[in-house]
């Protein structure tokens, strides 16, 4: 049997200002982080673990049968936390692909998680991510919606040129809403972490621009819809309604 060399890591911390204690908020009788964990496990792409600096999060994860790894509290980004967790969980270097899944996607489809791996079939790609087509001007103009700009290289694939909070690209044609889910080659993650923050990254406040400015290749899979993140009380209520209406919280829709 071929050894599975993919690791899904879910960085989680308690520092959200709009929703204090967000990873542990109850959704349908389970902490939000456990819903994300189970959907990652249902994707069936490899080992799954939560990377956290908070013992309460680790306890909640392990109490529900998941794996958690404690990390330092001073990481500047989720990618740094993921890199530390990778080193602790796989010091021998067997893992060659790392998926960084946000801990506030409790209703993400397992199939969406699987799709982020597809661009890495091309050895020239360093990092893979996702985007969905934007259908309203309101979404296109919203600075909280990150737009992915890229050159089409297939029916559902772009080679990333830029990411921005502005409305882009200008003119007629599709625009894409970036989904903050990444798959890294292990060596690409290390290279990314070692790069200094870049000028455009700091101006746009978008970490992925560091990779582009550093000469790394990011490819984007186009998916049908954007997973619902939970950032506000309204988002939380929506997630609760979706979970309540789903046929089974134990076996999420694929």
UniProtKB/Swiss-Prot annotation:
CDD domains xrefs: CMP-KDO-Synthetase (cd02517)
Database matches in Pfam families: CTP_transf_3
Origin superkingdom: Bacteria
Catalysed conversion reaction: 3-deoxy-alpha-D-manno-oct-2-ulosonate + CTP = CMP-3-deoxy-beta-D-manno-octulosonate + diphosphate
Main location: cytoplasm
Listed GO MF terms: 3-deoxy-manno-octulosonate cytidylyltransferase activity
Gene Ontology biological process terms from the UniProt entry: CMP-keto-3-deoxy-D-manno-octulosonic acid biosynthetic process; lipopolysaccharide biosynthetic process
Keyword annotations of the record: Cytoplasm, Lipopolysaccharide biosynthesis, Nucleotidyltransferase, Transferase
Name of this protein: 3-deoxy-manno-octulosonate cytidylyltransferase
Gene3D superfamilies, per database record: Spore Coat Polysaccharide Biosynthesis Protein SpsA, Chain A
Similarity field: Belongs to the KdsB family.
Localization, UniProt: Cytoplasm
Known function: Activates KDO (a required 8-carbon sugar) for incorporation into bacterial lipopolysaccharide in Gram-negative bacteria.
Pathway(s) it belongs to: Nucleotide-sugar biosynthesis; CMP-3-deoxy-D-manno-octulosonate biosynthesis; CMP-3-deoxy-D-manno-octulosonate from 3-deoxy-D-manno-octulosonate and CTP: step 1/1; Bacterial outer membrane biogenesis; lipopolysaccharide biosynthesis
Organism, scientific name: Nitrobacter winogradskyi (strain ATCC 25391 / DSM 10237 / CIP 104748 / NCIMB 11846 / Nb-255)
């Amino acid at each position: 049997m071929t050894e599975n060399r993919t690791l899904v890591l879910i960085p989680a911390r308690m520092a959200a200002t709009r929703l204090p204690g967000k990873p542990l908020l109850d959704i349908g009788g389970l902490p939000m982080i456990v819903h994300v964990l189970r959907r990652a496990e249902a994707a069936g792409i490899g080992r799954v673990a939560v990377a956290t600096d908070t013992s309460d999060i680790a306890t909640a994860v392990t109490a529900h049968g998941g794996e958690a790894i404690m990390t330092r509290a001073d990481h500047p980004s989720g990618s740094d936390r993921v890199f530390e967790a990778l080193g602790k969980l796989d010091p021998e270097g067997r893992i060659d692909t790392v998926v960084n899944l946000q801990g506030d996607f409790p209703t993400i489809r397992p199939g969406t998680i699987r799709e982020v791996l597809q661009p890495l079939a091309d050895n020239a790609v360093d990092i893979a991510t996702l985007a969905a087509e934007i259908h309203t001007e309101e979404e296109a103009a919203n600075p909280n919606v990150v737009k992915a700009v890229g050159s089409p290289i297939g029916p559902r694939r772009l080679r990333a040129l830029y990411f921005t909070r502005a409305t882009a690209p200008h003119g007629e044609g599709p625009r894409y809403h970036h989904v903050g889910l990444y798959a890294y080659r292990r060596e690409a993650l290390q290279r990314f972490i070692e790069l200094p923050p870049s000028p455009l990254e700091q101006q746009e406040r978008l970490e992925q621009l560091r990779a582009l400015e550093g000469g790394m290749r990011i490819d984007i899979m186009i998916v049908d819809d954007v997973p619902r993140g939970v950032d506000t009380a309204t988002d939380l209520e929506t997630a609760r309604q979706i979970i309540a209406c789903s046929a089974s919280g134990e076996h999420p829709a694929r």
